[in-house]
Amino acid sequence: MSKQVFETVFAGKKLVVETGQVAKQANGAVVVRYGDSTVLTAAVMSKKMATGDFFPLQVNYEEKMYAAGKFPGGWMKREGRPSTDATLTARLIDRPIRPMFAEGFRNEVQVINTVLSYDPDASAPMAAMFGSSLALAISDIPFNGPIAGVQVGYVNGELIINPDQAQQEASLLELTVAGNKDAINMVESGAKELSEEVMLEALLKGHAAIQELLDFQNQIVAAVGKEKADVELLQVDPELQAEIVAAYNDDLKKAVQVEEKLAREDATNAVRETVIATYEEKYAEHEEFDRIMRDVHEILELMEHTEVRRLITEDKVRPDGRRVDEIRPLDAEVDFLPNVHGSGLFTRGQTQALSVLTLAPMGETQIIDGLDDEYKKRFLHHYNFPQYSVGSTGRYGAPGRREIGHGALGERALEQVLPSLEDFPYAIRLVAEVLESNGSSSQASITAGTLALMAGGVPIKAPVAGIAMGLISDGTNYTVLTDIQGLEDHFGDMDFKVAGTRDGITALQMDIKIDGITPQILEEALAQAKKARFEILDVIEATIPEVRPDLAPTAPKIDTIKIDVDKIKIVIGKGGETIDKIIAETGVKIDIDEDGLVAIFSPDRAAIERTKEIIAGLVREAKVDEVFQAKVVRLEKFGAFVNLFDKTDALVHVSEMAWTRVNKPEDLVEVGDVVDVKVIKIDDKGRIDASMKALLPKPEGYVEPEKRERSEKPRRHKEHKEKKDNNFGEFKFHKVDKK
């Protein structure tokens, strides 16, 4: 295939697709250029069906640092494991693509997205999502797409498609929505307490914008698309299925309706084990034993799937006996742990999360160095899901994609209500430990996080609660479920997580297993979620009515002082000499950010106050009409130099010493004297003139004497000059004669 180029304009930026030139051995490959972001997407499929009971789809998103003209960090100077952002982007692409493959498709599929050049104003993740769909669509892989996705922002009351970097920074909404022609099938969002109405409008606007991208993909597929491969789908033997259903369906129905999770699992497992043992014995010598037993396992899964859905849609009964809009029993507790900076335990039915708060100086913030400019991440929310939470053994090690994704969702939900850095100069870390799980553990971790923050004295704007909504749909009729449990998530069609305050939504996440959902379902789910969210907020507020006024005794003491940006170098000093001297003197820890916010950390409040005084003195500037008690540090023929504060001197001319004529400064003052002076002038070079007589009453009948010419002699004495090499920015040390 020769190179072909397709071009359009989307959201004000050029969108160019190239095919037939690179990665030609892949089943499908495209180069997508959006603005100046360039992504290569290659899709490949295995020749044979994989073993296992799931579809082995793998989506990768690789950030190459050369794309932004940067060297990779670390000693190796080479890209290693994906960053958290890259992992989240891969999940973002996987989720809308996965439902678009046929039921029973088991061939392994890999979709690899490589960012080759990066433009911060043109979303590389959205280019990768577009490229992933298109690479699959033009390939021979049996993909029932296309899909597409867009980002939606909300700036000054206006919804914006694919906002640029400046618009993103000003936006109250960070929404990614994906779908096909008929419906939305993936949502990921953080928001600053926006209403359900605004969120729904944003979702619909995003879906409308997607249509343009879908049309563009269809044009390309029509021009270069391959014929789809004829692959084997996993299908069970219908006669075997009918036989097992007839013999064991009644037993499975009874097992599924056991309300308690562990007892229900025991009951369903007993039925499964009976069926499996029966057919293992029956077909032990059969030449297709492996295929038959694979079918038996698949049939049992289908039977349970069918019965759970039938109970909900026909009998209007959920496996645990709840109504469709009913939340499981709730319980909340704070101060579960001693010595930590804050803790909250939240239980919803058989799902339980413990959240633990840790506060630290800003020096502990995480430095993020990716394709964007390096920045410091102040708030971290980590989610851990040990296997004991579901009563089983399993992998134990570093967090996987699911744990990273759930942690990020909680982070988005809670960061919207955190106090500003100026009001609360701490790095904040929340760790959610899932202790029990029967569905919706990510939302339990959000609610537990709110409890921990409030108990720890972090002045959040409002409590945040989370709830997971589900859906059972047969294509014509549907039922929206509130607070889905594990079985409803596993056999249902939707997992729609909504977190927020009483004033609005702070985070959304939606994954579905069908082609898409309609605006009507979205609206109904958002309304039910709001009602449920308020019920959970009632429990939070009954447990801890307001944020505690003080931090935990074990939490670090931190205070701040704001300085001008151009004064930062004065506080730091040459080679860090000044700040090191302050730290050595007071025993504190000091962090200074690029905006001039100085955070001072110490367990000793007196040390913090002393440090603030020192820094305030270093950056202090005298003002005209300000009055000081100043020490005389040097005498000249034309006047006296006095120290106003720290390293700041002023000249008191002999004519400003008294209302009467003064011939020599030493007639009135000596070095070491302390005198009251008033600042009367600061010239454009920063030189300060002060007056003693301005603070004295003017004699009656006073006549202004003729002024003498001001000497042009340098105002700094010899010792100042000798210290020139030890300056801190524009700041000079001087010695004070103590004789």
Curated annotation (Swiss-Prot):
Keywords in alphabetical order: Cytoplasm, Magnesium, Metal-binding, Nucleotidyltransferase, RNA-binding, Transferase
Domain named KH: residues: 556-615
Gene Ontology MF annotations: 3'-5'-RNA exonuclease activity; magnesium ion binding; polyribonucleotide nucleotidyltransferase activity; RNA binding
Sites where the protein binds Mg(2+): 489, 495
Cellular component GO terms, alphabetical: cytosol
Stretch list, region Disordered: 699-739
A Pfam family reported for this protein in Swiss-Prot or TrEMBL: KH_1
This enzyme's EC code(s): 2.7.7.8
Family: Belongs to the polyribonucleotide nucleotidyltransferase family.
Name under which the protein is recorded: Polyribonucleotide nucleotidyltransferase
Organism: Streptococcus suis (strain 05ZYH33)
Gene: pnp
